[in-house]
Amino acid sequence: DGDTSNRRKELQKTISNFKHINLDIRNRSKILSFFERVKPNDIIHCAAQPSHDLAAKMPFEDFDINAASTLNILESMRRYTPKSTIVYLSTNKVYGDAPNFLKLKELNSRYTFADKKYANGINEDFSIDQTKHSLFGASKLSADIMVQEYGKYFDIKSCCIRGGCLTGPNHSSVQLHGFLNFLIKTNILKKKYTIFGYKGKQVRDNIHSKDVASFIKHFIEKPRIGEVYNLGGGKNNSVSIKEAFKLVSSITGNEMIYYYNKINRIG
């Protein structure tokens, strides 16, 4: 679960000029050497430790992977490829749990924002301060700000994508991350799914990986400096856990087996 080696093998089979380099982004000297040697035109930085829960158990590793390694990439760019473009896949978790403290309206199957100002979600100027992010959110936010800073300070073409729930047909999911794919897999295998708080009415903003790839392509074609984008599927593609249960069951014919943990998930 969560292993991406099969995806790599598929890429190697289907894309003739795909080249995989087994390189730990935490290794500063090797990252510097790679940039000096290869001099990439564009960098799409997707590497991450993606789990809230795991971050709390291994905070040093989480920060090294998410934050320090991003600095390795940025400084390598500055030294060897300052004209390159970098797209960093950040996360909406940079806003922490602050959105949960906005006034909410409870409906039968979901919560929605009561204030019409947030009818279509929150903007990029929403505060990232004085909120609980989870350690994962904090490490990703550190990298997010550093990408912006290298862009603004060194005039590096760059953006941070603060994505919703990215999903697609090749999503490698586990309980700790990969919401929609994991929920569907759990239903098909007739296993028990755990809901963490909020009565199962918490809403997830889902966006297909093809849409994310399309955005990245357009940004690289017309790059800007130090930009930030909230990238989601929009209200029409959002779904609460309760709603997802109903939708998946209508497709598979399997009733959702679940356990409700009343403790709200952090971040």
Regions found by a protein language model. Give the residues of each.
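N-terminal Rossmann-like NAD(P)+-binding domain of SDR-like oxidoreductases, especially those catalyzing
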Residues: 1-164
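Residue-level signal for the nucleotide or nucleotide-sugar donor/cofactor binding architecture
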Residues: 26, 57, 65-68, 134, ...
